[in-house]
UniProtKB/Swiss-Prot annotation:
Belongs to the SDHAF2 family. It comes from Drosophila willistoni (Fruit fly). This is Succinate dehydrogenase assembly factor 2-B, mitochondrial. SUPFAM superfamilies: YgfY-like (SSF109910). Plays an essential role in the assembly of succinate dehydrogenase (SDH), an enzyme complex (also referred to as respiratory complex II) that is a component of both the tricarboxylic acid (TCA) cycle and the mitochondrial electron transport chain, and which couples the oxidation of succinate to fumarate with the reduction of ubiquinone (coenzyme Q) to ubiquinol. Required for flavinylation (covalent attachment of FAD) of the flavoprotein subunit of the SDH catalytic dimer.
Amino acid sequence: MLRQILSSAVAKSTRGLSFTVNRLASNLDKSEYTTPGEIIDYDDPTHLPVPEYPLRPDEPLETRKQRLLYQSRKRGMLENDLLLSTFVAKYLRDFNADQTAQYDKLINGVSNDWDIFYWATETKATPAEYDNEIMQMLKQHVKNEERVQRIRQPDL
C-alpha cells in the first residue's frame, strides 16, 4: 500500500516537472545562443590604448632571432604557441634579415593574437600590410600537408 502511494506521488510530481521543463525549453530561442560555423569576434574597443611595440633597429640578427624564438613559444594562447613554435623551429634559422623583420612585425605588430590565428588558418582575409612571404609560409605550415603531429612545442 505504501509503495503504491509513493509511486503515484512520484509520478504526479515528475509529470508536473516534465511539463514545466518542456514548456520552458520550447520558449527558448536556440538560434540566439548558437552560431554554427560563425566566428564570434568583436572589434577591439577604441577606448583601450594598445601600446606600440618598440622598434629595435640596432638589434643584431642573432639576438633578434633568439627573441623571436622565445616570443613565438610564449604567446599566452595554446593554438598560436603550437603553430608559431613549430614554424620557428622549422624556418627561423634560415631567415635572412628581411624575412626576420617581416616575422617580427607579424607577431609583434598585431595587437590581437586571434588575428594571427585567423589569418594563418585562412579563416579571415589577411590585411595587405601582413600579407607577405612569411605569412604565406606560415599558411602553408598550418596546412600541415606532411601530417606532422603538433601536440607539443618542439624542444629547444
